[in-house]
C-alpha cells in the first residue's frame, strides 16, 4: 500500500511539474513584447497614438521621402568636422575605419549647389535676370545691387538670435561637402567613456535638470531614483518636459539606426551590415533597461510629431513660385520640387498633428524668458556635437541637431511665415540651403527609425 501511494504521489508530481512548465512557457514574454508592449496607444502631451503614426509613416510618407533624399539637392551637405571642442580638450578620436568620413571631391558636387547656400531662388541665383553669369561659380561678381542687399539681410538673419543652433561657417577652408548616401549613419564601434560623456553632458547640463535628480540607469541608482526622476519630470512645465523628450527621442532614433545597420560580418571578402536584435534589446528591452527602453521609443514618436508639425507649417515657404531646389539640372529641379510639395501636402493631411500652441502660452515675460532658455539650451547641445570623437557620428549628430533646430525655428516663426510675400525675397523668415537639407534629412532619419521599429517587431516575435 505504501509503495502504491508513493507511486501515485510521484506521478502526480510529474504531472504538476509538466503543467507548471507549460504554464511558465505560455506566460513567458517574447522580446517583442518586452520592447514594444508599452509603445502603443496615445502619447503623453499629445492627442495622437502610435498606431496612427506607424500607418501614416510606413505606407504613405516613408517611400516618397527616401526618393527625395536620394536627389542631388539633399544628398550633399557641407560641414566642418574639424572644429575644436569648445568644452574640453582630451577628445579621443576614434581610429576605426568605420568612424571616418569620406568628403566629396570638388567635381563630384553639382555646380548649382557649390555656388552658395542662400542661392536657391530665381532672385538669388539670377537665372533669368543675370545674363552675365556664365558660370554659377562666379555668381558673386554678377549680383545686382538689390540682390546684394537681400543677401546681406539674409546673412544677418542667419546670424540672428532666432537661431537654435551653432551653425558651421560653410565658407571656412575646413568646411567640406559630404555625400550623405556614401556616408550613411550606422554602427561604427564608437562607444565607451567618451560616448557616454557626450550624452551625459547633454542630459545633465542642458535638459533643465538639477544635479540632485538622478537619471534612471545613469549611475545604477535603482527603482527609487527612477520614480524620483519621473515625478520631477511630470512636475515640469510642458515646454521643459517636451525639451527632455525631444533629446531622448533623438538619442533613441540614433540607437535604432545603430542597431538596424550593424556590422555583422567583416572580413577580406565583404562587409555585411544588418539588424542586430541583441543590440536592439540591450538598448530598448523593458526588462534589460529597467523600463527605460519603451519610454525612449515613445519619446522617438514624440520627436516625430514635432518635426512632422514643423514640415506642415513651413509648406507656404516652399510653395512660393520663386523657390527652387536648385542644382543646375532644370528637369530634375522641377521634378524634385513637385515631389517635395507632394510630400508636404501629404504631411499637412496628417489628422492628428501636435498642437504647439500650448508652448509658451502663459505670461508674456515668462514665456519670452522660457523660450530664450529653450533656445540657448538647444544651441549649446549643437555645440557639444563638435566634441564627438567619431567623425561619422559627429557628421550625423551635427546634421540632426541642425535639422531639429530648424524645425523648432519654424514652429516659433508661424506669424513670420504667414506674412511672407508670395514672391521675391522674404526678409523676416528665411531658410538657408543648409537648413533645408538638414531639416529633411533629420526627419528622414526619424522616419526611417519608425519604419525600422516595424522590422524589429517582426524579428523579435519569436525571441524570448
Curated annotation (Swiss-Prot):
Disulfide bonds join 35-48, 37-46, 85-387, 94-99, 94-130, 99-104, 207-237, 390-393. The keyword Glycoprotein applies. Keywords: Apoptosis, Cell projection, Disulfide bond, Electron transport, Endoplasmic reticulum, FAD, Flavoprotein, Glycoprotein, Golgi apparatus, Membrane, Oxidoreductase, Phosphoprotein, Redox-active center, Secreted, Signal, Transport. Induction: Stimulated by hypoxia; suggesting that it is regulated via the HIF-pathway. Increased expression in brain after global cerebral ischemia. It is an enzyme of class 1 (oxidoreductase). Pfam families: ERO1. It is a peripheral membrane protein. It is found in: Endoplasmic reticulum membrane; Golgi apparatus lumen; Secreted; Cell projection, Dendrite. N-glycosylated. The Cys-94/Cys-99 and Cys-390/Cys-393 disulfide bonds constitute the redox-active center. The Cys-94/Cys-99 disulfide bond may accept electron from P4HB and funnel them to the active site disulfide Cys-390/Cys-393. The regulatory Cys-99/Cys-104 disulfide bond stabilizes the other regulatory bond Cys-94/Cys-130. One of its GO terms (cellular component) is extracellular space. Its main location: endoplasmic reticulum. GO terms for molecular function: FAD binding; oxidoreductase activity; protein-disulfide reductase activity; thiol oxidase activity. FAD binds at residues 186, 188, 199, 248, 251, 283, 296. The keyword Nucleotide-binding does not apply. Its cofactor is FAD. Residues 1-23 form the signal peptide. GO terms for biological process: brown fat cell differentiation; cell redox homeostasis; cellular response to hypoxia; chaperone cofactor-dependent protein refolding; collagen fibril organization; endoplasmic reticulum unfolded protein response; extracellular matrix organization; intrinsic apoptotic signaling pathway in response to endoplasmic reticulum stress. Oxidoreductase involved in disulfide bond formation in the endoplasmic reticulum. Efficiently reoxidizes P4HB/PDI, the enzyme catalyzing protein disulfide formation, in order to allow P4HB to sustain additional rounds of disulfide formation. Following P4HB reoxidation, passes its electrons to molecular oxygen via FAD, leading to the production of reactive oxygen species (ROS) in the cell. Required for the proper folding of immunoglobulins. Plays an important role in ER stress-induced, CHOP-dependent apoptosis by activating the inositol 1,4,5-trisphosphate receptor IP3R1. Predominantly monomer. May function both as a monomer and a homodimer. Interacts with PDILT. Interacts with ERP44; the interaction results in retention of ERO1A in the endoplasmic reticulum. This is ERO1-like protein alpha. It comes from Rattus norvegicus. The lineage of its organism: Eukaryota, Metazoa, Chordata, Craniata, Vertebrata. The gene is Ero1a.
Amino acid at each position: 500500500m505504501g509503495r502504491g501511494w508513493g507511486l501515485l504521489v510521484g506521478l502526480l508530481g510529474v504531472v504538476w511539474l509538466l503543467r507548471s512548465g507549460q504554464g511558465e512557457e505560455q506566460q513567458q514574454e517574447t522580446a517583442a513584447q518586452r520592447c514594444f508592449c508599452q509603445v502603443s496607444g496615445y502619447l503623453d502631451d499629445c492627442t495622437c497614438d502610435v498606431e496612427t503614426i506607424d500607418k501614416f509613416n510606413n505606407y504613405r510618407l516613408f517611400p516618397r521621402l527616401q526618393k527625395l533624399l536620394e536627389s542631388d539637392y539633399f544628398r550633399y551637405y557641407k560641414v566642418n568636422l574639424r572644429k575644436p571642442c569648445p568644452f574640453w580638450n582630451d577628445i579621443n578620436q576614434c581610429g576605426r575605419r568605420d568612424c571616418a568620413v569620406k568628403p566629396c571631391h570638388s567635381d563630384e558636387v553639382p555646380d548649382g549647389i557649390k555656388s552658395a547656400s542662400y542661392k536657391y531662388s530665381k532672385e538669388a541665383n539670377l537665372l533669368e535676370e543675370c545674363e552675365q553669369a556664365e558660370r554659377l561659380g562666379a555668381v558673386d561678381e554678377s549680383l545686382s545691387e538689390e540682390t546684394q542687399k537681400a543677401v546681406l539681410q539674409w546673412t544677418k538673419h542667419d546670424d540672428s538670435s532666432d537661431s537654435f543652433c551653432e551653425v558651421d561657417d560653410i565658407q571656412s577652408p575646413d568646411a567640406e561637402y559630404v555625400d550623405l548616401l556614401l556616408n550613411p549613419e550606422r554602427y561604427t564601434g564608437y562607444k565607451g567613456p567618451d560616448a557616454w560623456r557626450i550624452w551625459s553632458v547633454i542630459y545633465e547640463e542642458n535638459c533643465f535638470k538639477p544635479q540632485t535628480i538622478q537619471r534612471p540607469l545613469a549611475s545604477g541608482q535603482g527603482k527609487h531614483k527612477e520614480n524620483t526622476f519621473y515625478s520631477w519630470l511630470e512636475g515640469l512645465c510642458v515646454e521643459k518636459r517636451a525639451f527632455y523628450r525631444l533629446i531622448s527621442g533623438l538619442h533613441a532614433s540614433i540607437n535604432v539606426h545603430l542597431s538596424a545597420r550593424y556590422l555583422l560580418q567583416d572580413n577580406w571578402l565583404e562587409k555585411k551590415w544588418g539588424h542586430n536584435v541583441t543590440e536592439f534589446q540591450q538598448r530598448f528591452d523593458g526588462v534589460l533597461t529597467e523600463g527605460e527602453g519603451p519610454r525612449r521609443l515613445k519619446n522617438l514618436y514624440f520627436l516625430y510629431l514635432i518635426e512632422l508639425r514643423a514640415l506642415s507649417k513651413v509648406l507656404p515657404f516652399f510653395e512660393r513660385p520663386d523657390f527652387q531646389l536648385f542644382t543646375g539640372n532644370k528637369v530634375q529641379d522641377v521634378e524634385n520640387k513637385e515631389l517635395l510639395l507632394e510630400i508636404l501636402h501629404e504631411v499637412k493631411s496628417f489628422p492628428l498633428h501636435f498642437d504647439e500652441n500650448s508652448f509658451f502660452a502663459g505670461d508674456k515675460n515668462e514665456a519670452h524668458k522660457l523660450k530664450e532658455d529653450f533656445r540657448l539650451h538647444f544651441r549649446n547641445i549643437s555645440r557639444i556635437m563638435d566634441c564627438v570623437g567619431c567623425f561619422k557620428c559627429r557628421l550625423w549628430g551635427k546634421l540632426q541637431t541642425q535639422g531639429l533646430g530648424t524645425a523648432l525655428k519654424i514652429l516659433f516663426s508661424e506669424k513670420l511665415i504667414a506674412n511672407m510675400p508670395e514672391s521675391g525675397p522674404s526678409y523676416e523668415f528665411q531658410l538657408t540651403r543648409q537648413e533645408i537639407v538638414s531639416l529633411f534629412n533629420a526627419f528622414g532619419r526619424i522616419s526611417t527609425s519608425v519604419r525600422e521599429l516595424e522590422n524589429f517587431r517582426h524579428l523579435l516575435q519569436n525571441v524570448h
